[in-house]
Amino acid sequence: MKFLALLCLGMVGFAFGAEVSGLDMIKSYSIAGAVIGLGIAALGGAIGMGHAAAATISGTARNPGISGKLLGTMFIALALIEAQVIYTLVLALIALYANPFLS
């Protein structure tokens, strides 16, 4: 965890090396926020997908007769989990390319 925090601070630290304007500071914070937010969303999505797959496999092992229903429900759950990550990606791209604070 310390390594991850040090890595994130090192990525943001280059912006403070020289005199920068307010716009450059907003850009650097936007990049850092987008990277951190997308990383957290991807990590949470991966954990959620793993739990969904494990629960489906466990349910199929207990009752093989309903494996078709469980599989369909799992695919819907995986699509909803992945949609959350895609929404975070869209917000990160908006923060990077259409930032309202830069206009």
Curated annotation (Swiss-Prot):
TM stretches of this protein: 3-23, 30-50, 74-94
GO (cellular component) term, any one: plasma membrane
Keyword match Ion transport: yes
GO MF entries: lipid binding; proton-transporting ATP synthase activity, rotational mechanism
Localization: Cell inner membrane
NCBIfam families linked: ATP_synt_c, PRK08482.1
Biological role stated in the UniProt entry: F(1)F(0) ATP synthase produces ATP from ADP in the presence of a proton or sodium gradient. F-type ATPases consist of two structural domains, F(1) containing the extramembraneous catalytic core and F(0) containing the membrane proton channel, linked together by a central stalk and a peripheral stalk. During catalysis, ATP synthesis in the catalytic domain of F(1) is coupled via a rotary mechanism of the central stalk subunits to proton translocation.
Entry protein name: ATP synthase subunit c
Species this chain originates from: Helicobacter hepaticus (strain ATCC 51449 / 3B1)
